[in-house]
């Protein structure tokens, strides 16, 4: 009688295919997870962030971006007198008929037109029927603090009318300032180690801050240290 032998099936190629599929699936899952948790590297469009173009100057009143825009001419920042009247100092009056600026002091009334010059240039500008006052003139007659950044392409000015105290913190080490509170949010700028920021709002993991170089955004709380309250003093 002839003996019959069963042929053994080889599972090697099948196992190799399964292993390869598992490897591909693992790599794909790792890629998806990596993309989900990897910090975003996109840079924010700063002009879009401040809603400005050309020679426009963004105005931030008490750290809030305003719809109104200033202008930059003759090496100076000029702000719309209508906006100044509403939010900073109502004593400035623009006589549209006479094209004359009127300001009432306790003991006298001061007048100025486009020909009047200050230490750095014209005290006012009229553009497309709209009057603008120089930032220097506004500062001379108003109880405010200002910080302007007019040497960069993204021109902006911070006007603060609120006094009292502010919370500050020190950046623990080199960090990233983002548009929103999340690692995927676009990058505004880098924060250098030991730089000081003003803390505007604190959340669980992120804080909204204002930087020394004139940006407002979000930084992770673990990047901040030495928080303190500082009193603002009228000069």
Residue ranges and their predicted role:
Residues 213-223:
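A short macromolecule-binding patch
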């Amino acid at each position: 009688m002839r003996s019959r032998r069963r042929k053994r099936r080889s599972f090697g190629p099948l196992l190799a295919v399964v292993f390869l599929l598992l490897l591909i699936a693992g790599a794909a899952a790792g890629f998806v997870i990596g993309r989900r948790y990897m910090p975003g590297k996109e840079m924010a469009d700063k002009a879009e962030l401040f809603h400005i173009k050309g020679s426009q100057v963004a105005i931030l009143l008490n750290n809030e971006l305003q719809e109104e825009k200033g202008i930059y001419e003759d090496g100076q920042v000029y702000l719309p007198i209508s906006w100044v009247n509403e939010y900073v100092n109502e004593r400035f009056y623009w006589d549209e008929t006479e094209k004359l600026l009127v300001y009432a002091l306790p003991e006298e009334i001061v007048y100025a037109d486009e020909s009047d010059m200050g230490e750095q240039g014209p005290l006012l500008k009229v553009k497309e029927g709209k009057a603008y006052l120089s930032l220097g003139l506004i500062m001379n007659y108003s109880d405010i603090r200002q910080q302007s950044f007019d040497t960069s392409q993204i021109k902006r000015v911070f006007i603060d009318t609120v006094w009292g105290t502010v919370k500050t913190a020190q950046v623990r080490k080199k960090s990233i300032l983002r548009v929103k509170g999340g690692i995927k949010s676009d990058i505004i700028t880098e924060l250098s180690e030991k730089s000081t920021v003003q803390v505007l709002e604190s959340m669980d993991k992120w804080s909204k801050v204002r930087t020394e170089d004139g940006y407002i955004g979000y930084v992770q709380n673990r990047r901040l240290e030495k928080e303190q309250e500082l009193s603002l003093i009228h000069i």
